[in-house]
């Protein structure tokens, strides 16, 4: 038995030894795997497939693969064994994959066998293989545009390769689905095209005159043909062709007088179309040549302006108005300017010789000579004459004068744009000196004022009130002196020569003494206001006050003037030049160029304006050109001053007051006021629901008058019976002129309102003793600024009261007869009738005297009867208790008429009317059986008489 068990035991031991030695090999897998997993799926497809091999196969456990292990941080996969015998395995995702989150995953994998038994003892592992898993994309996202709205601008008339680019993106991760394959314009009939990259171009030239804004819709597709969820909008604006020019300016600029300085281009800017510039020069020109004489000046007359500016008197007018005392200008062509001043036209063949002595005020003796101190003053409009030779001078004035030492000579000539003054202090010994100026004003064919002050050896020329020193002083050396003979010629000059034909015009004057003179160097242009003053010079301040322009271009913002900017204004302020190198700085400077007019009552009208620009570019080939800008300044009508004359408009005085030596003042309480009315917009109240209207307010101003006139309403004055009186001494002291005729009385000259009030209050009306005048009307009116503004017509009505005790006087009886003959006219119109001739005053009919006495007695009787009737009526009321219906209470004081202070006022005109009716009956042979209606008319004053006597004073 023991022997049988021993072999069995040995067999089991051998079997156990052989089992331990069975798991000899490790599993084997590929070194690298490539895997693909679809997005939103968890199965990984590997290449090559996942198989693990073990050389211990087919042994159980040792030859079987029990599983796979994955190594890596956060590996979202797991590996499962499908068949232990074959070693087949699978990798799967723990959850659906998201390509957009992570496209690829890399980790390692290792296989292990089942060991040597079911307990997995002595398990062997394979090497680690690398696994690359790529997540395949699914087209789940639609394209999305970067912007919902695309805008662009194009210039008209051009074809663009690319106007703008639209862009869409896709949220998918793969190139197939994340890329946009093409775009599409959805709006039909648009002149645009879009390519696969989103670039938009125009298919035809766009015009600004056509459609100025194009709107259309575009969409996008990815390579999976998925369309964008939201389409994009595109707006393309068509702009006009870019032209370098000034932008932001107004053609019409309104200027209100009194506004001070007004910016001409407050919003202007220069459009250069992106062309770089390194120099800009602009010139602003204000044209005022059509306003009076060249520009807006004070509106007073020349005489009034000289007084206001403090100019000395004593000037002599060399070109006066043609008349009996000044006939040397009769042959010249005369024009009139806007200020009513005379202008003389010299056509190049005419000249005038001013006679010395007499009305001209220029004598030929030493006491009347011009010496070496004088002022020449004149207006001139001169342009370059094409047909005249380049070397030919034109003479304005030529004069030879005699002084204590001999003869001196001077001439003023123009030559092109040069003006020259030749002065020869002494023809016998001194050498002539020529002073030259080169001024553009001389040849611009515009009006300018020239004043030449000679204080030898100093000569100063003022043009429009601005002084200019000579550009050249030339000593002419020895030249042939002119004839030693006093002569003054305007418009040409004489040259001494024999056997020369004269070139004289219609009004040229010959010199009869000595050899014949040749008139040459005729002037071609306009002259006006030509005067000379000897012995005293006009000061600079006076000349500037008289002739300086009151309007022009202005620039005052020098503090903010940018770096590199230059500003230049010509003396007459009609031309302003700006220069700079930076566009923005230049724009700022130009925005501060202003127009200014210092006159309170500026001349209304249009002032043309021109802006010219020259630029320099870095590239001369593509340099731009800036077109000219033209506009105009409109000076509005100023608020007219209202001159109001007021005072007592009606008064009556006894005839003895008018017959006094001083007469009766016509305007004893005259008041003159000057005010300006202007629009004031009413302020809006928040609670007010109606419309807001404009109101006018008046501001009283201090101003001057330049003339007043007292005229007659009705017939002219009869110098034999009546006159207007005014103190001429006070007028002369103030430099005022008086003109007194039978039709009017005028006071001329600029003075303050206070002075005119004082003078007019002294105006008196005087009657000669015995003049039978009963009423007069006088009209007073005043004006200012050379008659530009006039006052109201203030009418004063005057009644002359004649006393009744004058009736018996023969002259008054006769006056009553004359008054009766025109009794059908109202008293104001009777004032101009003259007295009867003296032979009719020599006797008075006795019958007329008798009738007058009877009429007066009848009038007294009627008055007495009236008093008796009133007294009897009073007694009846007191005794009988009054009429029916009246109160019977005797204590009521209102029922009794107290006649203790009864006064009867007799109208003197009524008594005159009664007497005149009686005289008419005697002298005219009227019948005694006249109608009772006629008697009633004769006994009562007419309506006009009532108005004269009873109406309160009017205010006009």
Curated annotation (Swiss-Prot):
Residues 20-847 are extracellular. Its main location: membrane. The chain crosses the membrane at residues 848-868. Keywords: Calcium, Cell adhesion, Cell membrane, Cell projection, Endoplasmic reticulum, Glycoprotein, Golgi apparatus, Membrane, Postsynaptic cell membrane, Repeat, Signal, Synapse, Transmembrane, Transmembrane helix. Residues 29-145, 146-246 form the Cadherin domain. Proteolytically processed under normal cellular conditions. A primary zeta-cleavage generates a large extracellular (soluble) N-terminal domain (sAlc) and a short C-terminal transmembrane fragment (CTF1). A secondary cleavage catalyzed by gamma-secretase within the transmembrane domain releases the beta-Alc-beta chain in the extracellular milieu and produces an intracellular fragment (AlcICD). This processing is strongly suppressed in the tripartite complex formed with APBA2 and APP, which seems to prevent the association with gamma-secretase. Residues 1-19 form the signal peptide. Residues 943-956 have a biased composition (Basic and acidic residues). SMART domains: CA. Residues 869-956 are cytoplasmic. Pfam families: CLSTN_C. It is a single-pass type I membrane protein. GO terms for biological process: excitatory synapse assembly; homophilic cell adhesion via plasma membrane adhesion molecules; inhibitory synapse assembly; negative regulation of excitatory synapse assembly; positive regulation of inhibitory synapse assembly; positive regulation of synaptic transmission; regulation of excitatory synapse assembly. Residues 917-956 are annotated as: Disordered. One of its GO terms (cellular component) is cell surface. One of its GO terms (molecular function) is neurexin family protein binding. Gene3D superfamilies: 2.60.120.200, Cadherins (2.60.40.60). It is found in: Postsynaptic cell membrane; Endoplasmic reticulum membrane; Golgi apparatus membrane; Cell projection, Dendrite. Residues 927-937 have a biased composition (Acidic residues). Coiled coil: none annotated. PANTHER family: CALSYNTENIN, CALSYNTENIN-3. The cytoplasmic domain binds synaptic Ca(2+). Interacts (via cadherin domains) with both alpha and beta isoforms of neurexins (NRXN1, NRXN2 and NRXN3). Directly interacts with APBA2. Forms a tripartite complex with APBA2 and APP. Interacts with low affinity with KLC1. Interacts with SLC23A2/SVCT2. Postsynaptic adhesion molecule that binds to presynaptic neurexins to mediate both excitatory and inhibitory synapse formation. Promotes synapse development by acting as a cell adhesion molecule at the postsynaptic membrane, which associates with both neurexin-alpha and neurexin-beta proteins at the presynaptic membrane. Regulates the balance between excitatory and inhibitory synapses by inhibiting formation of excitatory parallel-fiber synapses and promoting formation of inhibitory synapses in the same neuron. Belongs to the calsyntenin family. This is Calsyntenin-3. It comes from Pongo abelii. The gene is CLSTN3.
